[in-house]
Curated annotation (Swiss-Prot):
Protein name: Mitogen-activated protein kinase 9
Comp. bias intervals (Low complexity): 388-417
Effect of K56N: In a head & Neck squamous cell carcinoma sample; somatic mutation
Protein family: Belongs to the protein kinase superfamily. CMGC Ser/Thr protein kinase family. MAP kinase subfamily.
Alphabetically ordered keywords of this record: ATP-binding, Biological rhythms, Cytoplasm, Kinase, Nucleotide-binding, Nucleus, Phosphoprotein, Serine/threonine-protein kinase, Transferase
GO biological process: apoptotic signaling pathway; cellular response to reactive oxygen species; cellular senescence; Fc-epsilon receptor signaling pathway; inflammatory response to wounding; JNK cascade; modulation of chemical synaptic transmission; positive regulation of apoptotic signaling pathway
UniProt-annotated location(s): Cytoplasm; Nucleus
Gene name for this UniProt entry: MAPK9
Taxonomic source organism: Homo sapiens (Human)
Length: 424
């Protein structure tokens, strides 16, 4: 590293077991989380005068997988612009040449909490439906550009105390082709759709299954399909939802179909029993109607056969959600992915390194006085959208205010390489 560059623009601080070498504009660094993708600190941006999250990517050039993931996250974050997607405020490296390049820092909005901290709260129907609406709007925005998130889970969804919600972590997101086959194990196990578990081709509504799992967790206060491994995860799904039909079985690879057909048969549990009235808010007759609608939405998202599962557009128009519908949010213009070969790219580590370095340098070129050119002037602050239907929604009372923009500590990727681990 150049001493002159480091001394004039950067300073170093020890954060847990990692050294953060950051621009001097970012002060008061405080670790708030870590995960497979990197370490995150809260900081104060002295240029913009706001609190931000600074994420140091974890060993981005350790191997081709890490490098491609880092490139993918950077490209997608630079493209998306939606109130329910976390905003990228800055990108930098303390190294001044490609030869020295080894660290990538992403600066993003800082939120108050992630959904892990909200799950154990008692949410009324207004708050729950509004959180889900925002989740679906963010996903719709990604899907409109052919981007599947693939790693939706409570720790990847962050909120403010006013109920504003944003989706983050795009290291596993990818652009989509119709009914394509991809790496089988991408989403954290508990939120993994059946078509992923079984190694089938999958499409955008793989994210809808994850939303259904998250909604179920918000309702029950606990993970709804908590498998101990890949096979047990499938067992937990069919024990509650029932063994899928012969029509679905025909879509499976022969070895997987043989395994699934030889498992014990389960009739499934009615959704009225999986999600009984008493676990929902029930203070009024209106709550009873909302409970019925919420349960119906769950029953349409948690469908084993993806061809019969609700789409994001249908979910946004569902009676439980549509009360919040705003075309400006739900039908926002799709992001323009400027790298058409984002998924087809395969490179050696050094080539990935050069691509990422160019992205970082491009950002620096477009930056001036701490604000990126052409970036909306309010992009540096969190959205304070207020649902027109109710003012009470704008407070998640007693929410922890420990600020966060961090994944949980578990890895998003499991080590297995095939459907049901080769059907043990």
């Amino acid at each position: 590293m150049s001493d002159s560059k480091c001394d004039s623009q950067f300073y170093s601080v020890q954060v847990a077991d990692s050294t953060f070498t950051v621009l001097k504009r970012y002060q008061q660094l405080k670790p708030i989380g870590s995960g497979a993708q990197g370490i995150v600190c809260a900081a104060f941006d002295t240029v913009l005068g706001i609190n931000v999250a600074v994420k140091k990517l974890s060993r981005p050039f350790q191997n081709q997988t890490h490098a491609k993931r880092a490139y993918r996250e950077l490209v997608l974050l630079k493209c998306v612009n939606h109130k329910n997607i976390i905003s990228l405020l800055n990108v930098f490296t303390p190294q001044k040449t490609l030869e020295e390049f080894q660290d990538v820092y992403l600066v993003m909005e800082l939120m108050d909490a992630n959904l892990c901290q909200v799950i154990h709260m008692e949410l009324d129907h207004e708050r729950m439906s509004y959180l889900l609406y925002q989740m679906l709007c963010g996903i719709k925005h990604l899907h409109s550009a052919g981007i599947i998130h693939r790693d939706l889970k409570p720790s990847n969804i962050v909120v403010k105390s006013d109920c504003t919600l944003k989706i983050l972590d795009f290291g596993l997101a990818r652009t989509a082709c119709t009914n394509f086959m991809m790496t089988p194990y991408v989403v954290t196990r508990y939120y993994r759709a059946p078509e992923v578990i079984l190694g089938m081709g999958y499409k955008e509504n793989v994210d809808i299954w994850s939303v259904g799992c998250i909604m179920g967790e918000l309702v029950k206060g606990c993970v709804i399909f908590q498998g101990t491994d890949h096979i047990d995860q499938w067992n937990k799904v069919i024990e509650q939802l029932g063994t899928p039909s012969a029509e679905f079985m025909k879509k499976l690879q022969p070895t997987v179909r043989n395994y699934v057909e030889n498992r014990p048969k389960y009739p499934g549990i009615k959704f009225e029993e999986l999600f009984p009235d008493w676990i929902f808010p029930s203070e009024s007759e209106r709550d009873k109607i909302k409970t019925s609608q919420a349960r119906d939405l769950l029953s349409k998202m948690l469908v084993i056969d993806p061809d019969k599962r609700i789409s994001v557009d249908e979910a946004l128009r569902h009676p439980y959600i549509t009360v919040w519908y705003d075309p400006a949010e739900a039908e926002a213009p799709p992001p323009q992915i400027y790298d058409a070969q984002l998924e087809e790219r395969e490179h050696a580590i050094e080539e990935w390194k050069e691509l990422i370095y160019k992205e970082v340098m491009d950002w620096e070129e477009r930056s001036k006085n701490g604000v990126v050119k052409d970036q909306p002037s309010d992009a540096a602050v969190s959205s304070n959208a207020t649902p027109s239907q109710s003012s009470s929604i704008n407070d998640i009372s007693s929410m922890s205010t420990e600020q966060t923009l961090a994944s949980d500590t578990d890895s998003s990727l499991d080590a297995s390489t095939g459907p049901l681990e080769g059907c043990r």
